[in-house]
Amino acid sequence: MAFSYNYSLQASYPSQRAYVPYQQTQVPTPSPIYSLPITNTTTSGALSPSSCFLSVRQQPKEALVTVKGKEKFRKPLDPPPMLELKVSSDIDPSQQFLQNPYLFVSVSLYKHDKDEPIEGTPFDVLAGTLVSSLHRLKDVNNKDGAFFIFGDISIKVQGTYRLRFTLYELQPSYFTLSDLEQHKDLERYQGAALDPPEYGTYQCLGHVLSDKFNVVLPKDFKGLEESTYLSRAFSDQGVRLRLRKEARGMMSNKRSISGSGDLTSDQSQQQQQQQPLAKKRREDSVESANPSSLMSGFYQNVSPFVNTPYLQSQGLQGQTLQNQGLQAPVRHDTSYAWNLAYDPSFMG
């Protein structure tokens, strides 16, 4: 019976086959992520130079020359130049240009007496952000407008100049997936990387020149002026600008007045009257915490000979407090120290 039992056990559990891992016969190709717009199309309702009106809303006045190698300590052009773009309502009745992401303005440095640029590339004479995209902001009259703001421009050459602002619109061209595949096939055929296909062109919509401004040395620089109302209005709407509450000259005058030691009695009295109340309270608390002032007032108000029932019971009648070596009352336990000289029932 034992033999048949073992045989039945083996028959119920047949031998397992060897594990064969799953092998994928064909590698799946990922679906393309390229968008498929219409080939060689441009933005509908493209702007024209005759329909755009670019104006300078805020003119620059003065700039501190930027020393080569010390660009970290440069000062921006003050006040920051701001431009406004207006489009004829006949061309764009719904004012769609306010949401146009393809509009931008570039800046270059020009001579003050001629319509000619300064020799050299823009990066040789200018520093900072030289291109601004369109900002849709509320104007001072609470109406939407298209603005280009240059809040970080510095000049590297000393003299008198003007800024030329040029308005451009990018006109993108779109390619289908087949166009991209043909470009890749051509690269593999030639065995070298080719220039990427042109995804668009741009057109110039106009330009405008700013007023003359001076670029001075540090010894002649008067400091940044107080920020204008327009700068504050745009800064409150999220535009990154450096704001200043008051002019640098006014701040230096205040420092010189406060640091002078030969003040008259009227000036010192006026400063004491303008002293904050919290500071006066701190001085009063320091004086009241002085042990000598506490004890002087205590001995002036209390007779040198104290006759109380408690002192009579302790045999201290008719003796002074100083002779008994009583400690001066401390500020945090004044009530307890005073009760040593009076009846303990004073506590209850």
UniProtKB/Swiss-Prot annotation:
Domain Velvet intervals: 46-244
Compartment(s): Nucleus
A single BP term in Gene Ontology: sporulation resulting in formation of a cellular spore
Inducing factors: Expression is up-regulated in conidia.
Alphabetized UniProt keyword annotations: Nucleus, Sporulation, Transcription, Transcription regulation
Polar residues: bias regions: 253-266
Example of a GO cellular component annotation carried by this entry: nucleus
Short sequence motif Nuclear localization signal: positions: 274-280
Nucleus in keyword set: yes
Disulfide cross-links: none
UniProt-annotated stretches for the region Disordered: 250-294
Entry-linked InterPro entries: Velvet, Velvet_dom, Velvet_dom_sf
Reported consequences of knocking out the gene: Reduces the amount of thehalose in conidia, tolerance to heat, oxidative and osmotic stress.
Subunit details: Forms a heterodimeric complex with VEL2; the formation of the VEL2-VOS1 complex is light-dependent.
Family indicated by similarity: Belongs to the velvet family. VosA subfamily.
Function in brief: Component of the velB-VosA heterodimeric complex that plays a dual role in activating genes associated with spore maturation and repressing certain development-associated genes. The complex binds DNA through the DNA-binding domain of vosA that recognizes an 11-nucleotide consensus sequence 5'-CTGGCCGCGGC-3' consisting of two motifs in the promoters of key developmental regulatory genes. Regulates spore viability, trehalose accumulation, and tolerance to thermal and oxidative as well as ion stresses. Positively regulates conidial pigmentation and pathogenicity on barley.
Domain description: The N-terminal velvet domain contains a NF-kappa-B-like fold and is involved in DNA-binding.
Name of the featured protein: Spore development regulator vosA
Species: Cochliobolus sativus (strain ND90Pr / ATCC 201652) (Common root rot and spot blotch fungus)
